[in-house]
Amino acid sequence: MNSVGKGVIKKDAMALVTGQPVYCDDLAPKDCLIVKLLRSPHAYAKIKSIDTSIAKRIPGIEAVYTYEDVPTSRFTLAGQSYPEPSPYDRRILENVVRYVGDEVAIVAGANEDCVDRALKAIKVDYEVLEPLLDFENSIDNAIVIHEEDDYKCLCEIGNDVKRNIVSSGESVVGDVDAVLKECDVVLERDYHTKANAQAMMETMRSYCYIDTYGRLNCVSSTQIPFHVRRILSNALEIPKSKINVIKPRIGGGFGAKQTACCEIFTAFVTWKLKKPSKIVYTREETFAASNSRHEMKMHVRIGATKDGKIEAIDLYTLSNQGAYGEHGPTTIGLAGHKSLPLYNHVKASRFTYDVVYTNTMRAGAYRGYGATQGQFAVESIINELADELNMDPCEIRFKNMTRENEVLSQYYNEELNACALDRCLEKAMEMIDYKNKPLRRDMGDFVRGLGVSLSMQGSGISGLDVGSVEIKLQDDGFYTLSIGATDMGTGCDTILAQMVAECMDCDVDQVVTSSLDTDHAPYDTGSYASSTTYVTGMAVVKACEKLRNSILEAAAGFFNVDKEDIEFDGKKINTLDHAHEMSLADFADTCFNGGIAKALIASDSHMSPTSPPPFMVGIAEVDVDKLTGEIKVHDYVSVVDCGTVINPNLARVQAEGGIVQGIGMALSEDITYSNEGKMRNRNFLQYKLPTRVDVPSVRVEFESSYEDNGPFGAKSIGEVVINTPTSAIASAIKHAMGVQVRTLPITAEKVLLGKENE
């Protein structure tokens, strides 16, 4: 292949590294209204009264809005295809606040100074209620977080709001209890993953204006422009035809911007006042009043024979949703359906779950989307089982891992067409010289341990999410590709252009990618669920096939021959007998200038009936100081099966970035709350992200498979890369120090205390 598989430089690379004005705040007019939010200091309270009279008299203030001024429809902020699984459990503003940071009032003014003064001048009388902060005690608690009568769910999600249950359910294959009774070895363990912040560089932000036609235009740093349009329509109670959402470049998202946290506030202000307005969340607001990864507790039972054949796995997961239900019913599913299928040969498996409300900040989407948490539990208990049986952790995986052409009973009964998981493990072992290293090595002042983990994810949401594109042959013979997908740093603008170049036999530089707005871009559900390469990529392939056919038909008409007598090699068009020949540039000019009088445009959409999983293996080599318990990741190798790699350079940095995020989740990142429900970690001094000195040698390689349903055999890569570090590092520490830490993050204190307890 000429373009696919090549390390093409990102099309927007120079603009981004030279600081060109491409982000949301760069594009907002300097004289637009500044919007800020008064937030609740209480985790749970009812608003008895709000006095905004003084605030409204401050010079420069345009408006102050409370719950009495906004529409009363309930909606969800989750960026999901309609009908959304997330419950409709919120309003723009309400007379009940459900976490510290919940919105109480909207203030719009000419500048930040007057808006800040107005926020301080608002007087709120609260009836403070006892908050529910412990998600283990949420179900059937006397404290009910959502008591409203107009709460509703569009889908059957096992919801019981009066019991604080957002969602519940189970997936059962075989008789787990009976099989466990027959097993030689049964382990039963509890694991706990904490909430994590996505910590993208660009905070939440948007600005809005009214155009010449009286329509609301929302410019937003979002992964989900088409979903934002629907959310604004629901929240403002206006038709979608009155709304256009524009997506500029995004300074990172990692799932956080799959929830429309801030757009409703500027949209409401602009719609009411008919003036442009913008909101830019502070870093503290983005930490404490947007969304995070779901905190989960997992109870796992596993049974096996003496020789290491796994017979049954039983996984129960409890998920802390926080105050509002965005993404709760869907993240939880991945905790089981993206972990249990890794070991598909079991006689029985069971996945049960509950998602519960608490008076903490809502959880949402974060790279991995529930699979990260579930795989920490399942991969950790696999490692513990190997230790219990005195088996090598790689050996037990080779013995039990899923293989190509199997039907995955806990993965919606999908057939596994492309799987190189076994080859990934073999290559990772070679990369780290695994066979020549013991699991534990005494290095003097520190001990070095090895740990292994497997991972899988999906490629889009099968049977639901859609990617669409439009491609045009322009005069002079170049192509414009219009997409609805959002490039949030992943390089999809470049990757999709590579696919066009491959299909049309041209250079990538001949393809101009346009990522437009909801008025002009073809419909795309958004950049999430690892969907863009796989789903939108297939739309590109289908549209290019149509365009090639249109070129052949137009040329046949122009040369007055049959279409079958035309050849097109990407650069020129000729008849088979070479009696007629024309360069593509001249042919395109002829199309535009009346010789053919036909614009050559093709569009297509794709929705996949399957979601083929990519796979990954990670092996961690970790050093632990004997005296202090200090943990350092010495080396980390990973091998990814994402089908055909479209752009190795971009795929590699995707993997490296995900691994670093996983290392942070394993060792340092932890959102905690005070007894009053206030988040403690609200800036980068308190929330400990891994820095460059914390990041080891991270080595990434690829092991190809070929997915028949993907573009050029490709699968996804965006999310699978974050999942392996937690369990691999935990196992490496266990081998080094003899301490199995089952609650993340793994700190020196936990290791030393665990050693004392041992």
Regions picked out by a protein language model, each given a short descriptive name:
Residues 1-160, 186, 272, 600:
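Flexible, low-hydrophobicity surface segments
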Residues 6, 12-15, 82-83, 87, ...:
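Glycine-rich loop/linker segments at domain edges
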Residues 67-68, 237-242, 272-277, 306, ...:
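C-terminal catalytic domains of large/alpha subunits in multi-subunit enzymes
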Residues 74-79, 118-121, 229-231, 254-260, ...:
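Short acidic, glycine/serine/threonine-rich loops at helix termini
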Residues 95-96, 239-242, 246-247, 271-282, ...:
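Conserved catalytic cysteine-centered active-site region
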Residues 145-236, 401-478, 680-701:
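Helix-loop-helix junctions that connect adjacent transmembrane helices in secondary transporters/permeases
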Residues 230, 251-274, 278-279, 492-500:
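Thiamine diphosphate
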